[in-house]
Amino acid sequence: MEGIGQKKETDYIFDKTIKCDVCGKEFKTKQVRTGKARFIGTDDILKPLYEGIDTCKYDIIMCPHCGYAASLRLFGHHTEKQRQAVRDNVSSRFTAKEPETETYSYERAVKRCKMAMLTEMVTGGKISESAYLCLKLAWIYRGEIQEAKANGAAQERISMYEKYEKEYLEDAYRGFKQARETEYPPIAGMDENTITYLLTSIGIHCGKIDEARRYGYALLISRTASMKLKNKTRDVLETIKKN
């Protein structure tokens, strides 16, 4: 039973009407109210943490009519050639219909993020953008793990989510590593120091200890990295010693 004054997830979100650039139809998508949820910080893989809501479930916009999907930052910013690629390769076969619900479940968030990955694939998006979507999927699965544990789910189910989280972290690691070598910052909206930090932290999760150390030490001696990021780097490097 919820306490008096305790906010529900629905208090943090609203329905926004959007016109799809691919099919031209209008639809409603749930988005987080700006400034409504209190920002707590980020975890070791930079998942944003808010009080009362996991905003990662609402990071993807997907048209329910044609299947076009992308992150909040990229939705509606594809070229006509890319939009046509979505029509030819996604919309022509899209049949999934989302039910009306008050909030988005983690399962639904996963499906939406995978549709965004499909959009990236058919539009020839940058490697970094695909890597960022893999990271988002890892964030979503991390949230699903926490929810499953809180609800007393079977260990088998929790282990399955943990497996998926690691798989997408591995994909994100490979993508960001390649993007760092082939793209100019900003990379997926992030500066080089942030990417280097992610390679340090994600590398540790993926067992790439030597590579993670190299990235981490390079960040610690960087003249452009913030003290906050350096302290976060020290924290994740410390986990190597503990383990």
Task: Enumerate the predicted regions with their spans.
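N-terminal cysteine/histidine-rich coordination modules
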Residues: 1-88
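Short, intrinsically disordered terminal segments enriched in charged and Pro/Gly residues
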Residues: 1-9, 92-96, 100-109, 223-231
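TPR/TPR-like alpha-solenoid helical repeat scaffolds
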Residues: 188-201, 226-243
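Amphipathic alpha-helical repeat scaffolds of TPR domains
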Residues: 85-117, 124-157, 190-205
